């Protein structure tokens, strides 16, 4: 005789309110034999089938017209593989029963996930194609410890939450289920009854692909193969390397002219990659490409942290783009957003009816500036989700570096908050200790697991040791954006030259703290939006002076210690602010040769010259690599310094930030001899006035500026020149 199933249990199963489906469904030992139970809505007949022979072993009785079937296979005591022949609407289908498979997640994996120390949680959680007991399908697993019931719904089950309720692994709070026949390319979500009894539909936090907005389903998709970083790519990230970064928003770099639609990943591989290579950049930095619902967030409010956006193509198309960049000798940096996530119902917000990924108190868990939620870094599973994501992009896509967004908002509890709007840490301070530990741990793990890849911090305060090792009290980043340098120098450049003498320190101050961090000098997307104007439009004067100022500024920037970053459009002096809904103004480069061509040629020459001469990059973070020659000539707004490599070779950099040419300008130098002008931002090649020094100048044994030898130069108006000493 079979074990009678309580009517309340059947009702709960059919209503989708039963939390332990494996205790009822599937094959079970009873006093009468092996009993098979199945919930198959809309089925009319069900048989248990012997797979090898196709023989019908037993017919299941319909105990509830809503689809609950049960039947006993007499004289059988040991579990065996079986299939179900199910008649739906007059058609017989042979299926494998999901409830005949045992637990999916190994005990060690479950323990590591609960401890938050699983290096690669994405290998266990999410949707993974698999073969179990000879049956192909997909195993699903999702962390939702407070949900009352979780089901997988998708194209394989008519989005019906009754058909595939999952098993809860109570020790870890993870729900799991293997669904035979579910395959790559099919859409799915998790349907759950949350902690409050509400029905929710959630996309998979670990989905490797997702639908493009406005749709929100996840896609079953295989885990990408690992990508090994080559030695060349590792060297290109090092502190002594020439690093010149072209920052790009893929959706607006260039668009189709007929319909203003985006270029695909593959089209970008064919157009953007060779352009960046031709321009002499060493790295491409991509604004976030994680799936996100709102175009206007530029990707900085992601909902699919493991899924490249489908706006530009498939996951494999994105890998094609990265491969093309690597083949062209370009490293790829990905903007990464572990600081916050949007409030959209389909994603992480109140995932299982509780504040699972975020803090429950809005003073800790809500960003007022962006209407987003803040990760609870103190919850081990949450920090594991994020650390694993960093490793995922590097290992599985070949990303060479991560630029971490909005670090200051993570490490300070009072970031952009008034008194009473934030909660102090356990010691009464303003630092977010859990976020600090998360960042240190992420950088430590990346250093251990993917040596050669690096991280960069956008950190807008003077928090000490952002790019210093953890054992020295630092956060462990390799590089930090120098936002102070950027603000000071742009504030200086926007001044009418007649007033610059009173703000000379805005150009000299940066060197005083230059060696406290490993700096990147950024002219990023943030500087050409929200009414700030374009970089060109911030320059003072008439059109000629605007372009001359910009060229002089770029010459100064590429010579100053620190790695370089330039947002797209700035390389040809786009006059408008950036618009994420439109292409860059490439028409400025159409027709006859003009000032925009001149700036573009200058940036290319700056990149190539900077890369060629080790003195310009080898000792960016060593005081030996820089020395002032003229630092105090405020009245004429002239600054001169040398850059130096490890062998002592020097390059002289001289800037004149007034429109007055300075003839016979004498200054002391360290190394006498013949000096050749290798770059002049006032060259006619760049549409300047072509003032200069006729190629080479010889030093004189005339003391100046405390040095025995000196040079006498013509300093062109609103220009920067670079000189290298010729071999004897």
UniProtKB/Swiss-Prot annotation:
Keywords: Carbohydrate metabolism, Glycogen biosynthesis, Glycogen metabolism, Glycosyltransferase, Transferase. GO terms for molecular function: 1,4-alpha-glucan branching enzyme activity; cation binding; hydrolase activity, hydrolyzing O-glycosyl compounds. InterPro entries: A-amylase/branching_C, Branching_enzy, GlgB, GlgB_N, GlgB_N_E_set_prok, Glyco_hydro_13_cat_dom, Glyco_hydro_13_N, Glyco_hydro_b. GO terms for biological process: glycogen biosynthetic process. Pathway: Glycan biosynthesis; glycogen biosynthesis. Belongs to the glycosyl hydrolase 13 family. GlgB subfamily. PANTHER family: 1,4-ALPHA-GLUCAN-BRANCHING ENZYME. This is 1,4-alpha-glucan branching enzyme GlgB. The gene is glgB.
């Amino acid at each position: 005789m079979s074990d009678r199933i309580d009517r309340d249990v059947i009702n709960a199963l059919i209503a989708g309110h039963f939390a332990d489906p494996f205790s009822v469904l599937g094959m079970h030992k009873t006093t009468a034999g092996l009993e098979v139970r199945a919930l198959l809505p809309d089925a009319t007949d069900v048989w248990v089938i012997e797979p090898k022979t196709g023989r019908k072993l037993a017919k299941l009785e319909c105990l509830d017209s809503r689809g609950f079937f049960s039947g006993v296979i007499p004289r059988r005591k040991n579990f065996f593989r079986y299939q179900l022949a199910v008649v739906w609407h007059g058609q017989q289908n042979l299926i494998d029963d999901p409830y005949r498979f045992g637990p999916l997640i190994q005990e060690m994996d479950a323990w590591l996930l609960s401890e938050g120390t699983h290096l690669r949680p994405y290998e266990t959680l999410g949707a993974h194609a698999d073969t179990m007991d000879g049956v192909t399908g997909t195993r699903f697993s999702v962390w939702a410890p407070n949900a009352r019931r979780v089901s997988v719904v998708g194209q394989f089950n008519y989005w019906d939450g009754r058909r595939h309720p999952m098993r809860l692994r109570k020790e870890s709070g993870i729900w799991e289920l293997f669904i035979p026949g579910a395959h790559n390319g099919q859409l799915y979500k998790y349907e759950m009854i949350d902690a409050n009894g509400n029905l929710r539909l959630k996309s998979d936090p670990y989905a490797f692909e997702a639908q493009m907005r406005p749709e929100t389903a996840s896609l079953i998709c295989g885990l990408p193969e690992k990508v090994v970083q080559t030695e060349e790519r590792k060297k290109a990230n090092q502190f002594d390397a020439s690093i010149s970064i072209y920052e790009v928003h893929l959706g607006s770099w260039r668009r189709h002219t007929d319909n203003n639609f985006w270029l695909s990943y593959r089209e970008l591989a064919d157009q953007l990659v060779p352009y960046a290579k031709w321009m002499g950049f060493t790295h491409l930095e991509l604004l976030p490409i994680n799936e996100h619902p709102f175009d206007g967030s530029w990707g900085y409010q992601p909902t699919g942290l493991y899924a490249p956006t489908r706006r530009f193509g498939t996951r494999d198309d994105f890998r094609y783009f990265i491969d093309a960049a690597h083949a062209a000798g370009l490293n790829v940096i990905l903007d990464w957003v572990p600081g916050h996530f949007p409030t959209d119902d389909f994603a992480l917000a109140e995932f299982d009816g509780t504040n699972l990924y975020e803090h429950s108190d809005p003073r800790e868990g809500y960003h007022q500036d962006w209407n987003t939620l803040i990760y609870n870094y103190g919850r081990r599973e949450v920090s594991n989700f994020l650390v694993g994501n960093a490793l995922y992009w590097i290992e599985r896509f070949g990303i060479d570096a991560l630029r971490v967004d909005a670090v200051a908002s993570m490490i300070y509890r009072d970031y952009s908050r008034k008194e009473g709007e934030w909660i102090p840490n356990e010691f009464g301070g303003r630092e977010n200790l859990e976020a600090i530990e998360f960042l240190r741990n992420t950088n430590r793990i990346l250093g251990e697991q993917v040596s050669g890849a690096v991280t960069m911090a956008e950190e807008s305060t003077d928090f000490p040791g952002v790019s210093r090792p953890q054992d020295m009290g630092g956060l462990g980043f390799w590089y930090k954006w120098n936002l102070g340098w950027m603000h000071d120098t742009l504030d200086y450049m926007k001044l009418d030259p007649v007033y610059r003498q009173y703000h000379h320190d805005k150009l000299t101050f940066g060197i005083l703290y230059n060696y406290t961090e490993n700096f990147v000098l950024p002219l990023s997307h943030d500087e050409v939006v929200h009414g700030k104007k374009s970089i060109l439009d911030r320059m003072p004067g008439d059109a000629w002076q605007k372009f001359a100022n910009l060229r002089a500024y770029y010459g100064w920037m590429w010579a100053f210690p620190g790695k370089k970053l330039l947002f797209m459009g700035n390389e040809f002096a786009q006059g408008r602010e950036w618009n994420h809904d439109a292409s860059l103004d490439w028409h400025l480069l159409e027709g006859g040769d003009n000032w925009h061509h001149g700036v573009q040629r200058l940036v290319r020459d700056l990149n190539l010259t900077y890369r060629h001469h080790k003195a310009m990059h080898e000792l960016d973070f060593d005081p030996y690599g820089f020395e002032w020659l003229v630092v105090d000539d405020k009245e004429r707004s002239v600054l001169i310094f040398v850059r130096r490599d490890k062998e002592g070779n020097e390059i002289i950099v001289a800037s004149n930030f007034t429109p007055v040419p300075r003839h016979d300008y004498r200054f002391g130098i360290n190394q006498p001899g013949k000096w050749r002008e290798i770059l002049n931002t006032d060259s006619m090649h760049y549409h300047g006035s072509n003032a200069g020094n006729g190629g080479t100048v010889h030093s004189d044994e005339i003391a100046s500026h405390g040095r025995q030898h000196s040079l006498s130069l013509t300093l062109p108006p609103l220009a920067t020149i670079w000189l290298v000493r010729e071999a004897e």
